[in-house]
Design a protein with these regions (language model features):
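Stable alpha-helical elements in mature extracytoplasmic
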Residues: 153-154, 223
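Cysteine-dependent deubiquitinase/ubiquitin-like isopeptidase catalytic cores across multiple families
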Residues: 2-143, 147, 159-162, 166-470
Length: 470
């Protein structure tokens, strides 16, 4: 990026999307990690000297000056590989920014293998006007711009859960951006039909199971269903997924059926809770509990945001929520699995890949149509992951975005990663002890479906005849 482009982009951001400033003394919570909002003031020692060029002796500096100087030093970086200007990061604590940047960020992408449109007459009306217009002359979608934000937010949830499982919560992108485990996770979400959690897989499964036409916006429940089913089909992910029903109830008996095997061993399980916390806005009685959900060490974030515009929320401070925004269109992320990928995934084509030679689409089903220059030779599939730092940088950002809780849409998807039974007990205690009205309810057992009779109830029915009536 040249200087003119960088300056132009900075001017546009300043006027139309200004970066938030660190204007609160409340602690910052990011997926269970607490950060102080201000770095400690600089305290001189007898051996300290004035930094070069300041012209101010240490004894004459105020706490405010030290804090400003520290903030400037924290953000004094060279331009990032993804083209972001470090000046926009403001005076946020560097440890918080490092953690924020380490979260995997999925956005709109363009130029990928086409996803064929549905031939169902209802499909067109299910798309937004913008999506219809930008794909008017195309038989398929080569970009998910305009309809894929909830899918991308769902990918963020799943990708960060897998990253924490493989690298731990304390791994930082800045220290080892090309770590093998990191590249392996990124490859799972490549914009390619062969990637197990690609946009193609989500759209295909949404059409087959959730009644979502290609190009139609997903809701939280459809995203959760796709995550659960796609993970179930890809055992190499090493994860189980539990999805709550129509409400915010988590049933312990059903959860343990998924999380605990026959030997009593607990497997890492992603809990997805789809809920609605109000009509048009989040009801204030839920505010404290929603903030507390991001303070739990099991939190993997929240997918939601505004009507038909989903974000991935990872942090909170006072009544503000910080998020990763998927509404930036970038070139496709190529599929580059490592050599340790399972032979079954490489050798055996999925249903989606097997249908990739077809160009027809009926009802709500979808077909992937590869172009000639996008087909990877079989010999390339098993090569070690070769993502460049520039490609990896498109999946991370230090650019903070913030939204007041009163501006958030009440429909959302909450995510928690439970790695053991002790972890589950800790999480259960946490959701039950929040202030205000809880956003998640843990019940011992799932109630029997309505209309299902209790066993033995028919034997307790007493018959009456006319002679027995008084």
């Amino acid at each position: 990026m040249n200087d003119f482009e960088r300056v132009s982009r900075s001017i546009v951001r300043t006027f139309y999307d200004p970066p938030p400033t660190n204007d609160s003394n409340d602690p910052i919570w990011l997926l269970g990690q607490r950060y102080d909002p201000r770095p400690p003031p600089w305290k001189p020692t007898p051996n300290d000297t004035s930094p070069a060029g300041t012209g101010t002796p240490p004894s004459e500096r105020t706490d405010d000056e030290s804090w400003i100087r520290t903030s400037i030093e924290e953000t004094d970086r060279k331009e990032a590989p993804n083209g972001e200007d470090p000046a926009q990061y403001g005076n946020w604590p560097s440890a918080f920014l490092d953690d924020f940047e380490s979260r995997i960020w999925m956005t709109y992408r363009s130029g990928f293998t086409p996803i064929q449109k549905s031939q169902d007459p209802k499909a067109t009306s299910a798309m937004s006007f913008r999506v219809r217009m930008q794909n008017l002359a195309s038989p398929g979608f080569t970009s998910d711009t305009g309809f894929g934000c909830m899918i991308r937010s769902g990918q963020c949830i799943l990708a960060n859960a897998l990253q924490i499982l493989r690298l731990g919560r304390d791994w930082r992108y800045q220290e080892q951006p090309d770590a093998k485990e990191h590249c392996d996770v990124v490859a799972m979400f490549a914009d390619d039909p062969r990637a197990p959690f690609s946009i193609h897989r989500f759209v295909e499964h949404g059409a087959a199971v959730c009644g979502k036409y290609p190009g139609e916006w997903f809701g939280p429940s459809a995203a959760a269903r796709c995550i659960q089913d796609l993970v179930h089909k890809n055992r190499e992910a090493g994860l189980k997924v539990y999805v709550s029903g129509d409400g915010a109830d988590v049933y312990e008996d059903k959860l343990k059926e998924i999380a605990v095997d026959d030997d009593g061993e607990w497997h890492p399980t992603l809990i997805l809770v789809g809920t609605r916390l109000g009509i048009d806005k989040i009801t204030p009685v839920y505010w404290e509990a929603l903030k507390a959900s991001l303070q739990m060490k099991q939190s993997i974030g929240i997918a939601g945001g505004r009507p038909s515009a989903s974000h991935y929320f990872v942090a909170t401070q006072a009544n503000n929520f910080f998020y990763l925004d998927p509404h930036s269109t970038r070139p496709l992320l190529p599929y580059r699995p490592s050599s340790s990928s399972t032979e079954e995934q490489v050798a055996a084509p999925s249903t989606l890949e097997a249908s990739a030679t077809s160009v027809t689409s009926t009802s709500s089903s979808t077909t992937i149509v590869p172009s000639a220059n996008e087909v990877t030779a079989p010999s390339d599939v098993s090569k070690p992951s070769g993502y460049s730092l520039e490609e990896l940088a498109t999946c991370h950002t230090r650019r903070i975005r913030r939204l007041q809780i009163r501006e958030m849409d009440p429909s959302m998807l909450l995510a928690f990663l439970i790695t053991s039974e002790d972890d589950y007990e800790d999480w259960k205690q946490g959701v039950r002890s929040v202030q205000g009205k809880s956003v998640v309810h843990v019940q011992d057992k799932e109630p029997a479906p309505r209309g299902q009779e209790r066993e033995g109830a028919i034997d307790e029915v007493e018959s009456w005849d006319e002679d027995g009536l008084q």
